[in-house]
Amino acid sequence: MSVDEILTLAQGVVQSWDWATEVSRPRPERLDVKVKEIKQLLPIIVGLRVKRLGYLSAIVGVDLGVEANEIEVIYYFCPESAVIALRVRVPRQGATLASLSDVIPSAEVFERELREMFGIEITGLHTTDHLYLPDDWPDGVYPLRRDFDRAAIAGAGDEV
């Protein structure tokens, strides 16, 4: 299948949730999907998986700042040389997303990173141990948030 055929098929899957999504093609090889209702994220991902439309290449967080009071989470799927980006916004405080690890086992490492670096609670994780940060890292301090304060971590990670 060509890249255009792949993305057209993916767009067809996503359009099943047209009330909950906004779709754009910013470049010929890319499909961007803004998921407006968090509860629709998992069914859309399952729909893409059923059609074998790529592998999960990354889940990334982007802190939109204190003023926006949101974090955007982007799920990247790569079928061949195409890119499908599913974007969902969550509140900076008390954000919760369901784990994809039962559907896509490799998602767990990305989800643990979101939890640790941005403070997004991921329900259904198989382990909640620290992935990158030291065990004595202070609770409630998230290093990839824009308002991260280095003074809050004085001494963290000093134990050997």
Residue ranges and their predicted role:
Residues 1-160:
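Terminal low-complexity/charged segments
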